[in-house]
């Protein structure tokens, strides 16, 4: 079986460490811990790394299409590697959750997230696994765009690093157990 784990974010140094890029941060941490590296694949508009874990090929992906077009890269890679949507996991930010809270889900709507909207539109289903990382709501008077494209303050970055450690553990547990249900029971709460 082959699986694909996608972290959502925006490419380029301008967006590094922004709230909208916690999906990229999570996948970066996973590949670092596994001692693998990304290769830019211009045909698929993505950075792709891979490893064998428990006799399964796992692709780690960071689309380079910008958030709102993430589905282009995801669909192209799923098709090329013949990966089922049931073997897709997407990690992304959620502004309706408190900073640093994580939640795993099996399926669901985009919830207003443009990267998830793009993936659903391109792959034709909402039925794929997700890990949401809370980035909190904008403060009074701040636009959503300025909030998600803003960087974490020092205290929130500490909280996010703890959350990224938890996401790392959750993904590794998921890859060992091969069960989103067990992973949800273990890490949602």
UniProtKB/Swiss-Prot annotation:
Localization per Swiss-Prot or TrEMBL: Cytoplasm
Record flagged with keyword Repeat: no
Catalyzed reactions per annotation: an N-acyl-L-alpha-aminoacyl-tRNA + H2O = an N-acyl-L-amino acid + a tRNA + H(+)
Positions marked as site (Discriminates between blocked and unblocked aminoacyl-tRNA): 10
Binding site for tRNA: 15, 66, 68, 114
Enzyme Commission number(s) of this protein: 3.1.1.29
GO CC terms: cytoplasm
Principal place of residence: cytoplasm
One GO molecular-function entry: tRNA binding
CDD domains, alphabetized: PTH
TM annotation in the entry: none
Catalytic center residues: 20 (proton acceptor)
InterPro entries xrefs: Pept_tRNA_hydro, Pept_tRNA_hydro_CS, Pept_tRNA_hydro_sf
Entry's Gene Ontology BP terms: protein quality control for misfolded or incompletely synthesized proteins; rescue of stalled ribosome
Similarity comment text for this entry: Belongs to the PTH family.
Function: Hydrolyzes ribosome-free peptidyl-tRNAs (with 1 or more amino acids incorporated), which drop off the ribosome during protein synthesis, or as a result of ribosome stalling.
Name used for this protein in its record: Peptidyl-tRNA hydrolase
Higher taxonomy: Bacteria, Bacillati, Bacillota, Bacilli, Lactobacillales
The encoding gene: pth
